[in-house]
């Protein structure tokens, strides 16, 4: 019997990322591995264009923000592998990784990106639920009588 699944799979996207800079970004529970190189402004996330991967416009704008700040929106190609979390955490992790990779390309961008707080890891995460409470801080409804 032949394996029909292997022939039905779509071919893997081959991207040449030699001479690229690598950085990791984190947000909430998401981790993004980012490869950045000089190019034409294409951004790939897990093998797809970022416009296909992220449905929400705010996430798309958030990802392009580091390039808009340095006025080089079409000068770099990005390949990113993202794991964990949801779309907001993944977009935030990508921004963190892209910003760190841009600094590796040009040290002069560090102060610009740092003032916008893009190279700093956003350490906010979900607070754990406490015993005796409904959620992390919300108590159960109190009744006097």
Residues covered by each model-derived region:
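N-terminal intrinsically disordered, low-complexity tails
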Residues: 1-13
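Structured, basic alpha/beta domains of bacterial-type, RNA-associated proteins
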Residues: 12-26, 32-83, 88, 92-145
């Amino acid at each position: 019997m032949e394996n029909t699944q292997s022939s039905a799979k779509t071919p893997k996207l081959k991207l040449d990322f030699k001479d690229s800079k690598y950085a990791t970004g984190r947000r909430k529970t998401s981790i993004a591995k980012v490869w950045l190189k000089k190019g034409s402004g294409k951004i790939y996330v897990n093998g797809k264009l970022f416009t296909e991967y992220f449905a929400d416009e705010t996430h798309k704008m958030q990802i392009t923000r580091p390039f808009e700040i340095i006025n080089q929106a079409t000068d770099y190609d990005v390949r990113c592998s993202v794991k964990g979390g949801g779309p907001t955490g993944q977009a935030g992790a990508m921004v963190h990784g892209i910003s760190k990779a841009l600094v590796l390309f040009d040290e002069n961008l560090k102060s610009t990106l740092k003032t916008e707080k893009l190279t700093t890891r956003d350490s906010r995460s979900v607070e754990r639920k406490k015993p005796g409470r409904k959620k992390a801080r919300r108590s159960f409804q109190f009744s006097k009588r």
